[in-house]
Amino acid sequence: MAKDAGLIEANGELKVFIDQNLSPGKGVVSLVAVHPSTVNSLGKQLLPKTFGQSNVNITQQVVIGTPQRPAAPNTIVVGSPHTPNTHFVSQNQPSDPSPWSAGKRNRKGEKNGKGLRHFSMKVCEKVQRKGTTSYNEVADELVAEFSAADSHILPSESAYDQKNIRRRVYDALNVLMAMNIISKEKKEIKWIGLPTNSAQECQSLEVERQRRLERIKQKQSQLQELILQQIAFKNLVQRNRQVEQQASRPPPPNSVIHLPFIIVNTSKKTVIDCSISNDKFEYLFNFDNTFEIHDDIEVLKRMGMACGLESGSCSPEDLRVARSLVPKALEPYVTEMAQGSLGGVFVASAVSTSNGTRLSASDLANGADGALATSSSGSQYSGSRVETPVSCVGEDDEDDEDFNENEEED
């Protein structure tokens, strides 16, 4: 294979040298460049093998050499930017450090992979995984991780790296706080979340809005139920006082049911299997037919102690009485309940889990059992029934209207 090389003379002409004797496997191309002003006179100059001899006097030249191609596979050519020497290195063996590279330069190159961006990502992952953490905890974990990875570093360099890691962690935490990804209160760091676009943020806010509306509805329902309980209890207290004043004596012990209580009623033909625990706090009932469970609040409502607010049939007189039984701050709620402007207050009896539970025959066929306690566990608001009054039953016509004759009470 023929190779060409050129020489620029003082007059600007390009002189071409051709060597036809170069073999294809050992071809060498050399380019010799000289400054035109440095050429004084013709003389003998020893040039590379490619050019042979020439009568050219060259005071300054730069030779760029391309060595012969490597015959062995998986080899690469390694050259120095400072010297024209080149050598071959096999790719299967780890290459030695370059002779012109300084240790400080290598160290700087290694640290380029551990910059603020790198540590920000690591710190972000740590805080996100922990949820709540501190600066020292994150820094200690990262120092331990990188120290284990760089076990070959000298102790002096390791101390420097630990200080650098802690400084980077501190900077990364400040960046994440500025981006509102994390929050810091004293020494406690909490994860907030990665920034999102407008569409995602709008969707997230809509979900949060619906969740809070559901919570508001639940709180309203609880407030309305508590108002009904207070009205029913105070109405019961006034009724019992009137009965005692008319009879001029307290009611007989066998005619009193203490609060709280649970009533289980079913047909007379129903076969009931009842098991009672030794401490008499748990009762296990098995029924072969449908039955109903009512708590004390449901019974008081059916007795009319809630002034008809639970069913929306509150008369103006009942509304006046109900408003007088609650604190002044709750009177507007009572008015709204009487008008039906607050939704979710009217609950059917023997269906709501807070007011009662009804089990069908199919539930009993599947082996459904009911565990009852004397602490009125069927009511959702049994905690507000401390030191409640007693109800006098047995001589009132209202009790006969509540339960049919073909039902029995337990």
Swiss-Prot record:
Modified residues (N6-acetyllysine): 3
Modified residues annotated as Phosphoserine in this record: 23
InterPro entries assigned: E2F-DP_heterodim, E2F_WHTH_DNA-bd_dom, TF_DP_C_sf, Transc_factor_DP_C, Transcrpt_fac_DP, WH-like_DNA-bd_sf, WH_DNA-bd_sf
Short sequence motif named DEF box, residue ranges: 161-195
Name the UniProt record assigns to this protein: Transcription factor Dp-1
Any one GO biological process: regulation of cell cycle
Biased amino acid composition, Low complexity: 375-384
